[in-house]
């Protein structure tokens, strides 16, 4: 009898996260109004080194402010708009961001 070994470490994405070549789309748990429009999903582009450096300057040593600046830039929202998101949806954005910047093969 031959035994077949299957690699079960393949990571699957949650149904609320869609990965593309250019970024991720995050489906929100709670719809929110952005610029007067009811929104149920946000698209985050992949960050560049310039994005990261600009957010570091904007944060001026404050990690939370740096993250808000970076996420706002990548999603196209102001800090005030990001702050209106429910925490669960902000965590989804964060998960999407780390999916973009972490190595797939590590």
Segments (PLM) and residue ranges:
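Short, surface-exposed, charged amphipathic helix/loop patches that serve as local interaction elements
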Residues: 2-106
């Amino acid at each position: 009898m031959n035994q077949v070994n299957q690699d079960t470490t393949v990571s699957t994405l949650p149904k609320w996260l869609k990965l593309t070549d250019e970024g991720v789309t995050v489906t929100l748990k709670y719809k929110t109004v952005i610029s007067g429009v009811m929104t149920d999903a946000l698209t985050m582009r992949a960050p560049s080194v310039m994005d990261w450096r600009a957010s570091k300057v904007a944060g001026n040593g404050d990690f939370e402010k740096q993250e808000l600046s970076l996420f706002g830039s990548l999603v196209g929202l102001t800090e005030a708009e990001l702050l209106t998101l429910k925490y669960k949806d902000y965590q989804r954005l964060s998960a999407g961001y780390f999916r973009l910047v972490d190595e797939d093969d590590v």
